[in-house]
Amino acid sequence: MAARLVQRCSRLLAASTAYAPATHTHIHECMKVCHPAQPVLPCSSLHSSSLCRHKDKALTKEQTVSSVPEHGKFESVLESLSSVEELLQLGVDREISGNQAAMIITQVSKVLMESKAQGGSVVQDERFQQLLVQAHNQISTIWNGNLVSLLKRLYILGIREDNKQLQAVENEVRWRLRRLSFKSLVQLSDLYVTFTRSPEQKHLVSDLVKNLELRWTEIEDAKSVVTLMTRVGFISKALMEKLEDKALEYAEQFTPDEMRKVALALAAQNRRTVPLLRALSYHLVQRHIGLSPAVVVDLAFAYGKLNFHQTQVFQKMASDLLPKVPEMSANDIARCVKSFAYLKWSNLPLFEAFAQASIDQSEKFTVPQLCNLVLAFGRLNFQPSKREEFYSMMHQKLHAELDLLDPYLLVDIVWSLCVLRQVDSSYISKVLEPGLYSRFFTDSSPRSANYRLKLAHINATALLEHPEYTGPHLPNESISTTHAVTANRKLSPLQSGLQEVLRELFPVEGTCRCGVNTVYGWYIDGEVVLDSDNKPLSLMDLEAPHLPHSQGKKPLPEGTRRFAFVAWDFPNFNSRSKDLLGRFVLTRRHLQAAGFLVVEVPYYEWLDLKSEWQKSAYLKDKINKVVAEEMAR
């Protein structure tokens, strides 16, 4: 009972001492709270910081009310002055407080920014230095909002980080963090990521983030969410998770530019937050607002980086971007087409416009930007309608700087030209020189392993599609090392299911090979040789030039056909399409050039087959169709 009395009385006494000493009336009020009907406060309310906070708020309110008229008059005087000279002289002509000195410094910085003038001479001015001293001497009297603005303006004016007055302002801000409004915390977040350099400033940022983690529920507008996500979200994972929740809450209020910033913030941290991305996509599609090229380019980059597919958003991007392609810069076109290629999404009118823009503005496109176009077209197997003009321009520019390209980029470009059927002997010989390809075979990194595979594909292009080529080739021992890439790959359910059915369809040992690594760098799910009556032959004695180490020497009998079974999974196709990506078009071409009849098994047909009998009948039907097509040629 005594504890409850002390607890309740302390709250009333703390509030009353802010204005007047205790009186008989106060004591009487304290006695009244002993009535059992009054609610019991939690013990945490007795904490001394809570009592002090009541007093601080009361005193602050009293000071604010008394100084509002004075502040309003001085602010009107500041707004009437339009030059730096007048503002500096104001501090000399009249007696000012530290708060007013901070306001003058802030206004001086604004005028300098508007006039785009240099602030070096102003900072050295004796009157400006006197303003700094005045603000420093009375720093405790500067209002919170003015203090944050002062700190920002001192950074913008280029005040050195070891300046005594600047350090005093930083320390004061750090001590006041808990008393600053949430809006001021957001302003500090926007400020400090740009200007943080010294250890003290980094400590302030750390304290700022801790305060934001505790007070994130005070966010009341979409702009604050965007600012915090882009400026400090990467510092704290816990804060970023809270900000994502708030972004989901305010997604409907985001402008397209704010959606762009949120998407970029997620992409920068590789945070694939699907609910938030879906919400952004929904509101982008629902609003009948045109997207600017800058917004489309950044959104495409973010979606590509996060591998997030949303067809309706892509269609809106394309429709909004198509009429503006002639006005886009070469860099924006290159970035946009690269992002869409990552997403495996091809819009024919938009890509035609990109190709036409590169032809019309060829002098503005650098070689790296043209390389982005070629890589994207190769990945998607896109051929522009004006291919002769486009490739003529591209070859002319590319040959001029071929020796200057990074080896990795050079291999990518030549490989893409192989896909697009635009490679010639000069490109092939360049990448198959021992001095260039040897660096990829001595490097054991996963990245180099992928490029060794691409070199095998380029070598296969020279062997199968360019009989006139007389330059260097990859040695057999180098090609054998590329098999490790596919040998360690886990089979997809489609591949394992196909191989299982093939073994049942051709049960005689030696008549069917499954999981074949070829010298061309391609993986075949199954291989059989059938005679003219569609009966399988033993593969052991037959020559197999596609194998690294073939034991058979006997040529194929007349009338026999060699079949290659390849499974096409969902990732092998363009998004929302039945068109293969360029890599797998090249696979089919090379296998056909090597003498195979290719039996393609796409996922969208295989999934409809439920029983083993259906799958066996499906493969037999596929074989008959391929034979019929071959005979019809």
Swiss-Prot record:
Cited Pfam families: FAST_1 (PF06743), FAST_2 (PF08368), RAP (PF08373)
Biological process terms in GO annotation: mitochondrial mRNA processing; mRNA metabolic process; regulation of mitochondrial mRNA stability
InterPro entries in UniProt: FAST_2, FAST_kinase, FAST_Leu-rich, RAP
Domain RAP span(s) in chain numbering: 563-621
PROSITE patterns assigned to the protein according to its UniProt record, in alphabetical order: RAP
Function: Plays a role in processing of mitochondrial RNA precursors and in stabilization of a subset of mature mitochondrial RNA species. May play a role in cell cycle progression.
Source species, domain of life: Eukaryota
Gene Ontology CC: mitochondrial matrix; mitochondrion
Protein's cellular compartments: Mitochondrion matrix
CDD domains named among the record's database cross-references: TBRG4-like_N
Record keywords: Mitochondrion, Transit peptide
Family stated for the protein in its record: Belongs to the FAST kinase family.
Primary localization: mitochondrion
Protein name from the UniProt record: FAST kinase domain-containing protein 4
